[in-house]
Amino acid sequence: MSAKPYRLAFTSGGLLAREAIVATPIYIRVHDWALVRAEIDADNLLQARTISSGRRTSRELVQRLSTLSEAEVELVVDATSSERGHMMWAAACRRYELIGDFAEEVMREKFLLLNPVLIPRDFDAFVRSKALWRAELESTTDSTMRKLRTNLFLMLREAGFVSDDGHIVASGLSQRVANVLAARTPSDIRFFPVVDVEAGKAAR
């Protein structure tokens, strides 16, 4: 059975953590992501410069947030800036398997092997290896792939996982974030630069 094609729509926007501050309280009130998006678009709550860009951003935001459980959405509402970034990183990894695979197979693997440098060429090599079995990667234009790579590394920096000089930074997960990530099977801690024993300490 062939693998489900990678979604490749994360060409801009970063983590959308600031935008999540707007959307999640609305969801707590209405409990319907379609209504959340409609309210955001109707009142331009994301303060987009154009209607079309606002709609694109709200669609992307809702698609990512909809991967979170009710408890996780409530956590985002009450989160610190760091916690919100971590939850939005988890949401991006869930929404986009390519991001999740890169996080687990490249970033976390490098971190665990004490190889602390993560650079754009690592993403290029990762994509080339996946393209052997993924036709959608083989057919993606160089321009689109550059946009994907640029936005992925923007997300990594916004989440605090990669420094400006390309070094992987250990993720200091809070207790409650570690708890919700570890509650999934398999654990979503696999998407973070943290060793399991550290995550276990945070979860207690």
List each model region and its residues:
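Helix-boundary capping/turn motifs
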Residues: 12-16, 31-33, 94-100, 126-130
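Accessory, usually C-terminal, subdomains that scaffold auxiliary metal cofactors
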Residues: 138-204
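Eukaryotic partner-binding/assembly regions in large regulatory complexes
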Residues: 1-86
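Short, leucine-enriched amphipathic alpha-helices that occur as contiguous helical runs
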Residues: 20, 99-100, 120, 149
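DNA-recognition alpha helix
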Residues: 119-135
